[in-house]
Amino acid sequence: YGVETIHLHQVSADLKAVPHISVYLKDEIPERLHYKNNYRIKDLLLIADEGWSILDIHNPKPERYIGGTHGYDNELFSMHAIFIADGPAFKNGYSRDTFENIDIYPLISHLLQLTPNQKIDGDLDRISDFLLKKD
């Protein structure tokens, strides 16, 4: 790395002064994001604050935004998904707080009476409260 590392640290420091973004060098990426060690993640990560986007200034049509974003920090309530379920396995009219999407796989496996053939991070026990009965 050498000179490139010095420039990277300077760029990181400069970007940290920009409002409405979080800036992380690869080794600073929070573990809770689960991609710190992914080969697709490069040396610098920027995450926009909720309601903000990071855009290329070379947009050929600056009067309109012609892209999409990948969302924001997954701990933000606005990034949580909606889950609606109906059927004989579910309590009628039941509502609960948000839960992690990783728990949907064990739920679907349970409903289909399938046993996952590998270790998974999801856990049916964390979301079984909306089922009529637990086996």
Q: Can you say where each PLM-predicted feature lies in the sequence?
A:
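Long, internal low-complexity/basic segments
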Residues: 104, 119-135
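Sec-exported extracytoplasmic/periplasmic mature domains
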Residues: 16, 20, 109-117, 132
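Active-site neighborhoods of enzymes that stabilize oxyanions during catalysis
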Residues: 1-95, 99-107
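Surface-exposed patches in mature extracellular/periplasmic domains of secreted proteins
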Residues: 25-27, 118-121
